[in-house]
Structure formats: C-alpha cells, structure tokens
Amino acid sequence: MIRFAVIGTNWITRQFVEAAHESGKYKLTAVYSRSLEQAQHFANDFSVEHLFTSLEAMAESDAIDAVYIASPNSLHFSQTQLFLSHKINVICEKPLASNLAEVDAAIACARENQVVLFEAFKTACLPNFHLLRQALPKVGKLRKVFFNYCQYSSRYQRYLDGENPNTFNPAFSNGSIMDIGFYCLASAVALFGEPKSVQATASLLASGVDAQGVVVMDYGDFSVTLQHSKVSDSVLASEIQGEAGSLVIEKLSECQKVCFVPRGSQMQDLTQPQHINTMLYEAELFATLVDEHLVDHPGLAVSRITAKLLTEIRRQTGVIFPADSVKL
C-alpha cells in the first residue's frame, strides 16, 4: 500500500484520489493546501490524518511514500525537486515542468535520489491508446497524422472581462500548447517518437500566452499536424492516415472511441471499454513503478522529448515564461 499525499485540492486532485483508492494500491495520508481550512474540507471526504500548510514540513514527514502534484504549472518543478530530494516518489500533473532545463534537472534529481518521477499524462495509459498503438500496422505505410484538441475555456470570459486567470497568465507557465495542446503533442511523441523537425505558429493574447496554434512535425515519410485552441471549439476527430486505411480517434485526450477505416471499405469500431475515471490507469502504472522501484522507466524519455518540443514551439511562437530566465 502506497501512502501518498496531494498538493492541490481541486477537482483533478479529487479525481486522482478516487482513482488511486479504486486501484486498491494507495492510501491517502496527507493533504497540503495554503489554507488549513481548505485542506480540512478536502480531507474530510477521505479520512486523512495529516494536514499541512508547509510543503517543507510535508516533505520531511514520515507519513508519505509518494506525492501527487496538481499545482499551477510554474510550481511543478520546485515542488517536484523538493520531494524528490527528500526521497519521496513523485507523480506530477502534465506538463512536468515549464521547460526542458527544468525537466532535465528533475529527472537527474530522481536518479540521484533513486526515486520514481512520473508525469501524469493519462492518455498514454488508457486501454484505447494501447489499442491504437497496436492497430497502427493496419493503416499500412504512414502518411499523415492529424491530432486535434480545441476547447473554449470556461475561464476565457474572465480574461475578456479584464481578469487574469492562471489559464492565460504566463507567470503560471500556461497557455494553449501547455494545457490542451500537450495532449496532442505528447500523444504523437508516445506513438512516433521524436520528429526530425518542428514548425509552429500561434495567436498570442495580450497577456503573452498562446490562445490557439498549429504545430507541424516532420517524420520523414509522414507528417504530424497538431491543432489546439482554448478560445474555440472543434467537433473534428483526430486521424492517423496510411496507404491502407485510417484510424479515427474521438476525443484524443480520453480516447473515447477508436475506429479503423480500411481504404475503400466500411468503418470498423475497435473501441474497448474503459473505466469511467480515466485516471485509474495512470495511478495503476505509477504504483507499479514505485512497487518495482523502476526509476529509469520509459516514460521519462517521452516526458523529455515532449518538454524539448514544447520549449522549441514556444521559442518559435514567442511565448516566454519567467521560468525561462532562471539559471539551473
């Protein structure tokens, strides 16, 4: 049983805790919040004994083996480093950090302290994503890939009203590519590895983050186009095209439905049932990595390549974070 703590008390933290408990491999033993009242309110639903308003105190506690980090993006690196250096296993929400330098430093820290560092990118852990990977040979020679995630942000009106929510604030290492565009990018890396080159364009808001963008990656015989937006909705599915047919994926981040369309023939539904809480699978994988002490697991390479591409995409589109000027 992995005794774990959480940083953050929002909806995604609650969903992860429920998934972790559903797996039967975890027990929530500590909650951190800047507000003791907020920590207590969250803890009441899960019978948690240890509450903290100090990250340092929680890192020094002997009540936890692992921590789930769901704080703003800009805080991921410093919090991850703190717990890794105290030999606490870390599962951190995507993106793992603000840039490649931070990701490299975090991976080095995990190896130095011989603990597991895991980026919580749930898509790659889903049964239908594994099915998608296994189905790739069906399309024959790969030619074109289109991954799409465009969703009008519930916080965009607040931005238009003159507020500066975290979602559109570069101080929090945020924006479209770092948020929902990440699912498209990391999915491509998980399936196809590192591209030969990347070209990116984006529309920037006055705050300095990207509102929407397009990324084109060259893999030689085939190309991958990523479309992302936080200021518009899209009803288009994602698609992997080959000379023998195409794979169609509805809602890529959740892999809700996967179909194969042979060239000149009818669509075939390949979809497998998935748990209603799609965070279950990443919770199970992280537990396996911790139980088997797999510090150098394959996910680290995907995280590093994704961070490298994110950093280059932001360089090309002119999105700059305060973290980019910090020397590590």
Curated annotation (Swiss-Prot):
PANTHER family: PTHR43054, SCYLLO-INOSITOL 2-DEHYDROGENASE (NADP(+)) IOLU. Its EC number is 1.-.-.-. It is an enzyme of class 1 (oxidoreductase). Pfam families: GFO_IDH_MocA (PF01408), GFO_IDH_MocA_C3 (PF22725). Belongs to the Gfo/Idh/MocA family. This is Uncharacterized oxidoreductase YgjR. InterPro entries: Gfo/Idh/MocA-like_OxRdtase_N, GFO_IDH_MocA-like_dom, NAD(P)-bd_dom_sf. Keywords: Oxidoreductase. GO terms for molecular function: nucleotide binding; oxidoreductase activity. It comes from the Bacteria.
